[in-house]
Amino acid sequence: MTLAPAAVDFSSFVAGRKFKTILADPPWQFQNRTGKIAPEHKRLNRYGTLSLDDIKSLPVASAADDTAHLYLWVPNALLPEGLAVMAAWGFKYKSNIVWQKIRKDGGPDGRGVGFYFRNVTEVLLFGTRGKNARTLQPGRTQVNIMCTRKREHSRKPDEQYPLISSCSPGPFLEMFARGKRDGWAIWGNQADESYSPSWATYSNHSQSPAELQLALA
């Protein structure tokens, strides 16, 4: 079987290293209700996507330690696909963390999309592989919800990093990362220090407070 370009690039990046905790936010493809691949809005040039088969073919199992944790972001409409990816990567689903997107006043941010309901949440699936793969002691009291404001399209909250690093052991790998992060190996076409969003979506709060301070300095 010929590996897709993303799988080849990932294998080259990992180069035999092993990680005990992996965080992934794949660029999922969506199908609309007619079964066709739903394109991004024409006014928003965001990012390319990968097919389900391409995501499943990434050799994540070879990058994971014998005992490891996986945190996998998945849209509400693609939960079955997320579970299939988790299994293809060699992990068993155990639990999840819900991200509730809120407004500045703390209420639910109703600008999400959805055919059946207006989505104000995303799900971070948690899976394990190997023996004795329970979370670290802080995980035993960590609630499985994050309530934060959304940033630019698809970007996940920075609050996930201290949560993950307190509940799971290193070394840490982030796949499809945006920007650099101390203490993490990062892979993806936006994984560099100069990353900043190239579209105006939610521009009024697309930066973290720290980034806003730097931008205004």
Predicted regions and their residues:
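Class I S-adenosyl-L-methionine-dependent methyltransferase catalytic core
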Residues: 1-217
